[in-house]
Curated annotation (Swiss-Prot):
The keyword Cell inner membrane does not apply. It comes from Methanococcus maripaludis (strain C5 / ATCC BAA-1333). This is DNA primase small subunit PriS. Heterodimer of a small subunit (PriS) and a large subunit (PriL). Belongs to the eukaryotic-type primase small subunit family. The gene is priS.
Length: 357
């Protein structure tokens, strides 16, 4: 604990708010995810760090929920993998991994339209995260892998991103996917990122995606539509056109900010649905594809725990910070009365402020 009384006061208040949230989320609304086959899942958590401890397991739902209520962690995780010995320290071999959920992690960075500090969030970078989820789903998961919205679980991470779980309704397909090893998962994500794109033998899906982009950039596509050997065709073009083609290809391949480690790591932890994100205080919230597609889900509105927007504090914010809008209310370093929802964001971002009496 910090020796600074003001800092201790803030930490204690934040801890109390997290406790209030979990009391409501668990006892009243049943929001908190209970990982499937709980005894075979590893649990991790963080308070002042993203992950303070892991290698924890529980035999029953009751034990797990009692522990969450007691600890009320700022960050809460479960393993994607199912393990024989989830509480053992070590890699997949020691833990006895026998299957694994497959999930994508889209984590966007500050965009060209953002005017804030790199660590902040706004409608622009959150909008970019939404767009990337739709690209992943509509350009790849639906057409290439025959999945439907019923086969996906989409989760707002509580920050600038989303987790997209593959949960096919077909039990045989689900079983097959969850048995994928590291190599299969790596091939899967590298295909989507275009890392194994072969310009001398273009597959139909990537071909269609790129031709669509070529047309937007006024690049003649007739010969690309007829041929699979694009490398030879590109090399016949003028230098300026050739450069434009390669730049377009690179731009399309870099559209998605996918965290490859989430797909690659055998013992990866992912945020627990129904918890709060310790850096923002926003909810880790499952949403529907239709609410994302129609732009009905607004992270800076629907991601805020409503009760925390009604608890007010008088504060002195001691450093200049970018504005943030939560539930339609905008706050910045000049704000002197703020809701708990904004207080959690300030705390999570290490902003220097004090709570006044």
């Amino acid at each position: 604990m910090n020796e600074n009384p003001a800092a201790n006061k803030i930490f204690n208040e934040v801890s109390s708010l997290y406790k209030q949230y979990f009391e409501y989320a668990i006892k009243v609304r049943k929001w908190l995810e209970i990982p499937d086959d709980l005894p075979h899942r590893e649990i991790g958590y963080g308070m002042l760090k993203k992950v303070d401890n892991r290698n924890i397991s529980f035999n029953t739902e009751g034990e797990y929920l009692t522990w969450v209520l007691k600890e009320s962690p700022f960050h809460l995780y479960k393993s994607l993998s199912y393990m024989e010995y989830p509480d053992l320290v070590g890699g997949a071999a020691k833990k006895g991994l026998f299957k694994r959920e497959v999930a994508f992690d889209i984590d966007t960075h500050k965009t060209e339209k953002c005017t804030h500090d790199d660590s902040w969030i706004c409608e622009e970078c959150l909008g970019e995260a939404r767009n990337q989820v739709l690209i992943l789903i509509e350009d790849f998961l639906f057409p290439d892998f025959g999945l439907s919205e019923k086969d996906l679980k989409i989760v707002f991470t509580g920050n600038r991103g989303y987790h997209i779980y593959l949960k096919p309704e077909d039990p045989e397909l689900l079983k097959k996917i969850e048995k994928w090893g590291k190599n299969e998962r790596r091939y899967f994500i590298e295909y989507i990122l275009g890392k194994n794109l072969n310009l001398r033998n273009m597959g139909s899906r990537w071909k269609n995606i790129l031709i669509s982009e070529f047309k937007k950039n006024k690049i003649a596509t007739k010969k690309f539509e007829k041929n699979s050997d694009w490398k030879t065709e590109i090399d016949t073009r003028k230098d300026t056109t050739r450069r434009k083609i390669y730049e377009t290809i690179d731009k399309v391949k870099s559209r998605l900010e996918l965290d490859e480690k989430v797909m690659d790591d055998d013992i990866r932890l992912l945020r627990t649905i129904g918890s709060l994100h310790g850096y923002t205080g926003l909810m880790v919230k499952e949403i529907t594809y239709s609410s994302l597609k129609s732009n009905q889900f607004d992270p800076l509105n629907h991601g805020v725990f409503s009760k925390f927007h009604k608890i007010m504090y008088n504060v002195n914010i001691k450093q200049e910070i970018d504005p943030l809008t939560l539930k339609g209310d905008t706050f910045n370093h000049k704000s002197t009365e703020i809701p708990a929802s904004y207080l959690l964001f300030l705390f999570g971002h290490g902003i220097d402020f004090e709570i006044l009496e």
